Each structure stands twice: as C-alpha cells, then as structure tokens.
Curated annotation (Swiss-Prot):
InterPro entries: cDENN_dom, dDENN_dom, DENN_C, DENN_domain_containing_2, Tripartite_DENN, uDENN_dom
Alphabetic keyword roster: Guanine-nucleotide releasing factor, Phosphoprotein
Annotated gene: Dennd2c
Modified-residue entries (Phosphoserine), positions: 261
Record-given protein name: DENN domain-containing protein 2C
dDENN domain boundaries: 784-874
Domain cDENN residues, every copy: 649-782
Domain uDENN: residue ranges: 480-627
Pfam families: dDENN (PF03455), DENN (PF02141), uDENN (PF03456)
PANTHER family to which the protein is assigned, alphabetical: DENN DOMAIN-CONTAINING PROTEIN 2 (PTHR15288), DENN DOMAIN-CONTAINING PROTEIN 2C (PTHR15288:SF6)
Annotated region (Disordered), positions in chain: 46-98, 411-446
Compositional bias per record (Basic and acidic residues), positions renumbered to this chain: 56-68
C-alpha cells in the first residue's frame, strides 16, 4: 500500500487553500515531485499520523558530514504558476535542510512509540502543527562532537524532555522556539530507497491566525502532557476534509513570489493588538500585512494592490524578539483617506478688515474684532454688521460722562463721509464753506503760522511712535548703564565725574558701543545741571528727577537720577545715582535707586552684586511683576518686587504735580503750542518739578509722540541749545534764567512753573484749538475733583491719571478718530492715507483749519506712517475709543442740494411768520 498521496489527491490539495497549518504542510508534502523517488514514499508528517501500520526497515547510518547538517540561512523558493490547469501544481524546489541520518534502530523505536498513540479527532485549532519555524544557528554548532547514539535526546532537549515523551509545554509561552536539530524531510544524496518512517513531530506553533476564531484558546505554560501528546497524533482524513474556495485577488489565485514570511502574523497575534487598533482607528483593521494565501508556509507574502500615496515605501519586518510599537506600524488600507488641508493659521488671517467685502464676514467677526476698518466700503459693511448685531457696550461711567460733555459742547456737527474719487484733490487752505450760521471764526495769524511750519515739516525722517517704542522695548534689558556721579573740585569750580560704573569697562563680555561712550560723556552734566552753583553742605533734601537723551536716529534713553548727600561728617558734596534705560517707567526705577542708596550706605561693594541681579532679571511686561533676589548684610537674602503698571503710557507720569504748577487754561495753551511743534521752555527751582511736569505734558499728546528735541532738565553749560531754530521742549532751572535772557531767541513760549505764568508767549495760543472742543476739554479738567469723587464711590480704580488720559483721548478722537475711513488699499496691498478727504470730512470750519496746520507737523506724519506700515490692527486705547466713536456716526448725511432746500424752507417759515 502506497503511503504517499495519490496524483488526484495532489491535484486536489494544490487547489485547496486550507485554513490551518496542518493542511497547508500536508498539501506541500503531497506536491513535492521535485524530490527523489524515495522521498515520495516517506510519510511527510508534522505530528500527523498518515499510516501507522507500515513497517519501517532500518536506514543506513549517515556519515558524520550528513549528521552535522545545518539549516541554510536563505531558502530559495520558486513561485508556482497561478493557473488552475497545471497538473501537479507548483513545487518547492529550493534547497531544504539535509537529513541528518538518524540511527535506524533509534528511529524505529521512536516510530513504534508514536504508532501506539490513538487517533484523536480534534478541531481545526487542535490539529495545528505545533511550533514556529524560526531558530538560531547556535544549537546546530554545538552537536558536532556528540556521539551518534544521542541525537533523539538532543532533539527533545530544547522542549524540556524528561526521557521518553517530548514536553511541549514550554513552547506555549516562549518567544524563540528551537527547532528539531535534524531535518527529516530531505533525502541526502545517494541514499537508497527504503521503507518510509514516521518522523519526529515538529514543535507546536505558539500563535493563532486571525481567521481562526473558533480555535482552542491559548494554553498556559503548565499544560498537561496528555494534551500535548494528543496533538501529535491526528486522523489523516482531516487533511482533506475541508476544501474551502481558494482565495483570489483580482480574479486569479495569488502567486507565491515576493511574499513575506509569517513573521508578521506571529508578532501581530502574539502581541495583543487591540490597543494599536484603537490608536489607528476602530475600522482600520490590522496594521501589518499578512498573507491572504495559505499555499505554502515558506512563500513570500505578496502585497495587495497599493492604494495609498506611500506605495513606494517598503515595510520592514520586525525581529521576533521585538514588539512593534504603535507609532511605527504602517496604517491599514482603510485608514488612508483623502487628506484635508489644515486650517489656516491665525497669524495669516488678517485681523483688520482689509480687502474683505463680504457683509457676512463683518456680521460674524465685528463683535470679536476691536480693530478699525481701513476703507470707506468696509466701513459701510462694518456699520451694517453693527446694526444687525447692535449691542449696548458696557462703557465705564467715566468714559460715558466725558463723551456726553463733548457731545453737548460740539453740537450736531459731526464727521461726514467723503467719497473717494481716486485723485487727491488740491488743498483749499482759504475755503469758507460750511454752515453759514457757524459762529466759529478763523484766527488772524493761521496762514502765517502755516507758512512757518511747512519748511520744517520733514526735518527728521525717523518717526517715533509710542506703540513702536513699546514693541522695541520688549527685547531690551531692564537698564543699560548705572553710574555714580560726584563733584570734583577744580580751579575753575566743581566738575561732575563718574566715580562708579556698572557694568564697568573691564567686565568680561561687556563691549561698550560708540553711542554709549558718547552719551556717557554728557551724562554727568545732566546729573548735575547746576554744578557751577554747587557747594559743600551739611544737609540736603534728596530728590529724584529724570532726563532724556535723544540720538541722531531718534532713539531715546531715559536717565533716572537720585540726588543725595553721602554718609559722613561735616560739609560734603552731593552725589547722584543714575540709571540709564530705554524704558520709561519712573516709579520702577525710583524703587531700584532707593535700594541702591540703602546698600551704598553700608558699603559701595554691595552695589555691584545688586545691580548685576537687576540686570539679569527679565524685562517686565506691562502689568507684570518681577522678583529680584539679593543679599543684604544683617538681613540675609531679600526679594524685591518690581512692577510695571498695566497702562504703560502713564507709568512715568505724575499729573498731580502738573496741576499744582499750572492752571487748566495754561495747560491747554501749552499743549496747543506743542501740537503745532513750537518751542516751549519750562522754568522751575526744582529738578524733580521740571522732570515730572515735562513728562506729564508729553503724555497728554497721546496717540501722538513728540518727535523733536526733548530735555526735561537742561544743564547750564548747554544753554545755547535754546537758540536752535528747530522745535524743542526744554526745562531749565531758575538759576539759568539770566543766561537765557541774554540769548537771541526766536518765538518761544516760556512758562514759569513756580508762579503759574507765561514769561514770554506768541499771544495766539488761545486761538489754535477748535473752540468748541477746547471748551469741552477745559470743562472736564476743571471739574476733575467732582468727577473723581463721584466715580470713586463706584470704582476705586478711577484715578486722576485715567481721567486726564481719557479726556485728551476723546479730544483727539473728535479730531482724527475717523482716519481709518480714509485709508485706501492699493493693488499691491499697501495702505495709502487720503489727506484731503480726511480733512474735508469735518463739517466744522474751525476743525478743518486746525487740521490744515496740524497735518503738516511731524507728529501727524509719524502717526499716519505708523498706521500705513502696520499690517495688523493697532489695539491701543485710542483705537478702542475711535471704534466706539465710529459706531455713533450716522450712515448717511444730507447732500449739498438737501442742505440748500432745507435752508430755503427755514427762510420761507421765517417770512411766513412776518
């Protein structure tokens, strides 16, 4: 009786794609017609019993070379034809591991032992041949010197055998499973044909396929030996009992070429992949490519048709001892979908309303956007959105009161919309158009002052604005330089000199720029502006003041000084501690100077560590607090908190000192002179009074910035600067007044802060500002005490600084708050300011004539240029109030014809009454 498979069985199994390894290997054994004739009569067994009654004559004893046969590293596998019409089916012609020639007596004993097992019918899962097919080459090298009578024991040793029966329990939980050392499925060359024998069972596989859902569950390490033995003897009828339809791909049976091994499935099923599936998507399926054909376990896995854009990227298999991580697994085919573009980053989305002509855009965005529209068309859409989503804003009561005051003083005259024709209309300086009943008048010397301002309107191209200064400061350090200045006696008198400096020139990593060296030469003179009148004294009241150094490029350095009398006995000369910084924050640096004074009284050596800790501190943002730690003898480690106010515009401003020195009407006249960039000189007896009043007046110009010479305290030795024909704002001590009277000075406004009077004036300061707006501003400032008393009952946050700031901001909103309606956008995306439509949009002639003068100043040019160059909206206090002001402007104004008809109607009513 032939124990091999018949030709018909071979053809049947060649078309069968079994769902388990037993059928798979049985099919492969039956098709092997490329093996020798003797191999056909060998029962190819993977632990499956085909014919237990066949006698097995002894084999020839193999040679030592055959006995030491080893598995080759690479297996050459040929692909079979995919057609079903081929007779024998594709065979494996690759080199199989050579048989090692076991002793026939030992083999026969083992065969009889296996034949004694009863045939047990088990399910598909139990009939799986055990063991995977990966092993190390190391055990093969260790059997060279062993006697030929122990090969069976060696074969069973990796399975923890105790003698007769192989113990396969260890295979259930091990990673690397050792294969039998002798391959019995290959006939060595020259071996005689003989009766077939039953070979040793292969180790049981330690994994299940994903398609086998009804198999026996995975057993633990301590499974009993009977269960393991029952797997080794299986009814051969099960090999062909299940013949499912062959799996096809693309209408053809899949070939065997270019297929990867089952290593993917080993890893995928042995490691719990549920967590990976959840990460890659519930419906993503398996992330590893596994076989869809089960013809041969030694075939390479072929990939299905690639349906993703990454088809050229090969998938690398993972070693058996490594578990693939979720983020390295390739996504499944179902996971690939049409990619969606990411959302547009916020910094690419224009927050202003440029080039936006969709009314729906404004209706959806206007409630969140506090920037200003930039064109007239956009403003109309902006208004439509506001009407659709009209909500009453919760303005502070102080702001509402200020707005009511201006509206009551201004009357019905508001800004009207001027259509843009595409050409800049010539400026008509002497126009008298407007409401004939307007009681406003034109000052006599307006045209004369305009002629004087025009030649000097573009003297400095380096425009500076407050917003730009604040942005540049964010990348600076807290201060640039700290010096201690003292007076040194010389034959001509006392001369100020620097006696201590930090950082010093010798400090490592400190490189002093040329600009710093030039400014360092003049700093001592600003620290002691009255050095000629100084003398040793027993007592001196310390005072704090500041000065400003303006560079050729328009940059400014603030000097914060503290003048005091050093410790000692007898008459002593005063000293000045000076900190130079780009940040304008008077209160913050005053606190630092107080700490310096405390340490210098103990020892001058304590100043350096403290100043170094301050310089290394981060630059504080508005409203933020930084902590500086330092050591103080007797007190230990100290922490000093330095805080910047939230409103950075007013952090170096003291309006109380200003109102103590000047009345409201004098203050308005000084501000009007500065708006037209005239020359102004403050005179006072105290250094602190000069610096505080000077900073306060400059702060009232917001949102504009003084662009010219600004020296809060001018040294006597530099008094010649007042002869300059350019605009300036300078403060001098009263002791320098005699020197000032001897100098040839052009038109200048000299203000005595101590006496609250004008020493010299142009005599037209009251006629500069529009009278109605000026009256509203004066009323608010004069009633400041009453307003503050009422507002502080409801909110403690209302201060004098906030009241003065809001009043002046409202004044400028009435004048130029509609500037954004006259910004046009060119084809290149550049903003261009339309000057003439901007000026003509005011219905008041006094406002238009003031704008004739003010629009020629460098302050206004810097303001416009800053708005033209900015790509994002400016969100300062002025912009917020201007937006609220634009909401109150009516959408349409009566045309010129309507005004004529309305005036005729009023005249007819007047005649009818007569």
């Amino acid at each position: 009786m032939d124990v091999g498979f018949t030709r018909s069985a071979v053809q049947t199994l060649s078309r069968s794609h079994c769902k388990n390894i037993k059928q798979k290997i049985s099919q492969w054994e039956g098709r092997a017609n490329g093996v020798t004739k003797t191999a056909k009569f060998h029962p190819k067994d993977f632990g499956v019993r085909y014919n237990c009654h066949q006698e097995s004559p002894p084999h020839k004893r193999p040679t030592g070379e055959e006995r030491n046969g080893a598995l080759p590293r690479n297996t050459d596998v040929k692909s079979r034809d995919q057609s079903e019409d081929e007779g024998e089916g594709g065979e494996c012609r690759g080199s199989h591991p050579s048989e090692a020639g076991l002793d026939s007596s030992l083999v026969c004993a083992r065969v009889k032992q296996i034949e004694g097992c009863q045939a047990v019918a088990v399910g598909p899962e139990a009939s799986l041949p055990p063991g995977n097919f990966y092993t190390s080459q190391i055990p093969w090298r260790s059997i060279d010197g062993l006697s030929p009578d122990k090969p069976l024991n060696l074969a069973l040793a990796p399975c923890n055998s105790t003698g007769r029966e192989p113990d396969l329990s260890v295979l259930d939980s091990s990673y690397g499973i050792t294969k039998s050392l002798e391959n019995i499925y290959y006939e060595p060359e020259g071996q005689e044909c003989g009766p077939s024998i039953n070979p040793l069972p292969k180790p049981r596989r330690t994994f299940r396929y994903l398609s086998e859902s009804d198999g026996i569950p995975y057993k633990e390490r301590n499974c009993d030996q009977k269960y393991c033995e029952s797997i080794s003897c299986v009814d051969p009828s099960l090999a062909s009992s299940q013949d499912p339809e062959p799996k096809k791909y693309g209408g053809k049976i899949r070939g065997r070429s270019k297929r990867k091994s089952f290593e993917f499935e080993d890893i995928q099923h042995f490691r719990n992949s549920r967590k990976i599936h959840e990460e890659l998507g519930r419906n993503a399926g398996s992330a590893l490519y596994y076989t869809q054909s089960e013809d041969n376990i030694y075939e390479d896995i072929i990939y299905p048709a690639k349906e993703n854009p990454y088809e050229d990227i090969p998938v690398q298999s993972f070693p058996v001892w490594r578990s693939p991580s979720a983020w390295r697994l390739p996504p499944a085919k179902s996971a690939f979908r049409t990619p969606k573009l990411p959302p547009k980053p916020q910094f690419f989305q224009r927050k202003t309303m440029e080039l936006k002509n969709s009314q729906a855009y404004f209706r959806s965005k206007i409630t969140k956007d506090t920037t200003l529209p930039v064109t007239l068309t956009e403003w109309k859409l902006f208004r439509a959105g506001e009407v659709a989503n009209k909500k009453k804003r919760n303005l502070p009561p102080l702001v509402l009161k200020i707005n009511d005051t201006f509206e009551s003083k201004r009357g019905k005259k508001r800004v009207k919309l001027q259509p843009y024709t595409g050409k800049e209309a010539p400026s008509s300086k002497g126009e008298t158009s407007g409401n004939e009943s307007d009681a406003e008048y034109l000052p006599k010397n307006r045209h004369k002052r305009l002629a004087q301002l025009q030649p000097s309107s573009k003297r400095n191209p380096h425009y500076q604005t407050l917003e730009r200064d604040l942005i540049e400061l964010q990348e600076q350090q807290l201060f640039e330089l700290f010096v201690v200045v003292s007076l040194q006696k010389k034959p001509a008198g006392y001369t100020p000199q620097v006696i201590q400096q930090f950082p010093s020139k010798g400090d490592h990593g400190y490189k002093q720029s040329k600009d710093t060296e030039e400014r360092l030469k003049v700093i001592p003179r600003f620290c002691f502006p009255d050095s000629e009148d100084s003398a040793p004294t027993l007592e001196l009241k310390s005072e704090t003041f500041s000065f400003v150094l303006t560079g050729e490029d328009g940059s400014r350095w603030f000097g914060y000084c503290k003048k005091l009398l050093p410790e000692g006995r007898g008459k002593r000369l005063p000293e000045v501690y000076c900190m130079v910084s780009r940040l304008g924050c008077f209160n913050l640096f005053s606190k630092i100077l107080d700490e310096v004074e405390k340490r210098r009284e103990m020892s001058p050596a304590l100043v350096y560590p403290f100043m170094r800790s301050v310089m290394e501190a981060p630059f504080p943002a508005p409203g933020r607090t930084i902590t500086v730690k330092s050591y103080l003898p007797g007190a230990g480690d100290e922490s000093i908190e330095l805080c910047r106010p939230l409103d950075s515009r007013l952090e170096h401003v003291d309006f109380e000192c200003l109102f103590k020195c000047l009345s409201v009407r004098h203050l308005i006249r000084v501000c009007a002179s500065l708006l037209l960039e005239r020359r102004v000189i403050f005179v006072a007896n105290s250094l602190s009074t000069l610096s505080k009043c000077g900073h306060a007046v400059v702060a009232t110009l917001y949102p504009f910035t003084w662009q010219h010479t600004y020296i809060p305290v001018l040294p006597v030795s530099m008094i010649d600067i007042v002869c300059s024909p350019t605009p300036f704002f300078i403060g001098i001590l009263s002791c320098s007044l005699p020197h000032l009277q001897d100098l040839p000075i052009e038109e200048v406004l000299i203000v005595d802060l101590c006496a609250d009077r004008f020493l010299q004036e142009v005599s037209d300061e009251d006629e500069i500002l529009p009278p109605k707006l000026q009256a509203a501003l004066v009323q608010i400032l004069e009633d400041r005490d009453e307003v503050l008393a009422q507002e502080q009952q409801f909110s403690q946050e209302v201060t004098l600084s906030s009241l003065v700031s809001e009043a002046f901001v409202r004044f400028f909103v009435e004048l130029v708050g509609h500037y954004s309606l006259n910004m046009t956008v060119t084809e290149r995306g550049e903003r261009v300011f339309q000057r003439e439509p901007f000026r003509k949009s005011h219905t008041s002639r006094s406002v238009r004539h003031f704008l004739d003068l003010f629009m020629e100043t460098q302050m206004f040019a810097g303001f416009v240029q800053d708005r033209e160059l900015r790509q994002s909206g400016v969100k300062g206090l002025f912009e917020v109030r201007a937006l609220q002001y634009l909401e109150t402007i009516p959408e349409s104004e009566p045309s010129g014809v309507n005004r004529i008809l309305r005036s005729l109607g009023s005249k007819m009513k007047f005649l009818h009454k007569k």
